[in-house]
Amino acid sequence: MPVTNSPRTLFDKIWDDHVVERLEDGTCILYIDRHLVHEVTSPQAFEGLRMSGRRVRRPDATVAVADHNVPTSDRSKPIEEPQSRLQIETLEKNVAEFGVPYFPLRSASQGIVHVVGPEQGISLPGMTIVCGDSHTSTHGALGSLAFGIGTSEVEHVLATQTILQKPAKNMRVSVEGKVGPGVTAKDILLAIIGRIGTAGGTGHVIEFAGSAIRDLDMAGRMTLCNMSIEAGARAGLVAPDETTFAYVKGRPFAPKGEAFEQACDYWRSLASDDGAYFDTEVTLAAEEIIPSVTWGTSPQNVLPIDGSVPSPSDEPDPARAAQIQRALDYMGLEAGQKIAGTPVDVVFIGSCTNSRLEDLRAAADVVRGRHVAEGVRAMIVPGSGLVKHAAEAEGLDKVFLDAGFEWREAGCSMCLGMNPDRLTPGQRCASTSNRNFEGRQGPDGRTHLCSPAMAAAAAVTGRLCDVRELVKETV
């Protein structure tokens, strides 16, 4: 499609490169480079193809993974829960019938779809990527336009390799400066959501920029883009750079040799032009961000670890005051109490937000030489089989096992209550996942979102605490 010569954002460039046709109302037929599929949102889509006599248009651009319902315990045993077993069996039947590449449950490469895609080189800069999952935005860390779609759209992409979409607005969130000790990408993202709220990015694609973002490794950038959804955005992006190219090089599905160098030449053009227009701009100072944790039932209910739980009486808006009170009642907290010192029952380190090798290393650095507090259940769930094997090669599994953690198989696990890993009513969990809604990790479970390092600190102390205090002890 023809494009203007005016300065363009990264989002605009990727969008324009993939528009097949622009309709009168502004809706575009958008070509999709990669379609990622999992067991929960695909059964009806494949059945729709079957009923209409259609095939998958680009099986070579489609990849399937089982992750949401899979058990993370003993894989040698059959899946006990009937609905979970049926969904995985249905996925296996569908990918075989329609010729879609699949990472099966017992494959060394199986894992969470948003971990597998980047680590395999399936997701690459400049691509359009969709999946029937809201956290598809994770892949934007590579400089791709990646977003979640519904089941009917899954069928449409399977059949046509296109999707009908209207372009989003542009938003740039810049984080400038150097973060302090103990501050991670998760803390940066929670600070952003604390600033703009869970509706702050509605209707926008967020480009994360600034010196603090450039300093992040790829795992950190994936954490940021993963939770752009919790900021209300359609997707999140980080412009590709040398860090990106070094990460992609040598991945199984990435270009090789001269093709890789040619790809890098194109990828270097994927940056917002000077003077490009952003509908919304937000800037944060990195040095003002400290380790953080959520207190309520929304990701925007976030506090620095030295903060106090808000009081409804301090909120002039009656509706907002009622929301605070409901969250306090659900979470079993008192207005005005310090969030540090809140006891935890469970610690979960995993999910598509924070289950990569770098996340496990950060947690192990806190855990090493310590032990899980009495009465606390702590579990590590690697994001993929490859992450698990790499961690074991470094001896991280031994660090966690010696400390009293459970060392599990790859999967979505306790991020959501769709598999055997879930909270029981009233249990309080320090979790590295992305959502702390009521019942998200199990009926009446209480979730505090935090970084892997903060979760590890909670595991060994039995309470929410400032990880910087533990790091001081080892210096």
Swiss-Prot record:
Cofactor needs: [4Fe-4S] cluster
InterPro entries named among the record's database cross-references: 3-IsopropMal_deHydase_lsu, Acnase/IPM_dHydase_lsu_aba_1/3, Acoase/IPM_deHydtase_lsu_aba, Aconitase_4Fe-4S_BS, Aconitase_4Fe-4S_dom, IPM_dehydratase_rel_enz, IPMI_cat
Metal-binding keyword on record: yes
EC assignment: 4.2.1.33
Cofactor note: Binds 1 [4Fe-4S] cluster per subunit.
Record's catalysed reaction(s): (2R,3S)-3-isopropylmalate = (2S)-2-isopropylmalate
PANTHER family noted in UniProt: 3-ISOPROPYLMALATE DEHYDRATASE (PTHR43822:SF9), HOMOACONITASE, MITOCHONDRIAL-RELATED (PTHR43822)
A Pfam family hit: Aconitase
Coiled-coil zones: none
Chain positions recorded as [4Fe-4S] cluster binding sites: C352, C412, C415
Gene that produces this protein: leuC
Subunit structure, as described in the record: Heterodimer of LeuC and LeuD.
Family recorded in the similarity comment: Belongs to the aconitase/IPM isomerase family. LeuC type 1 subfamily.
Record-level GO BP terms: L-leucine biosynthetic process
Protein name stated in the entry: 3-isopropylmalate dehydratase large subunit
Enzyme class: lyase
Organism lineage string: Bacteria, Pseudomonadati, Pseudomonadota, Alphaproteobacteria, Acetobacterales
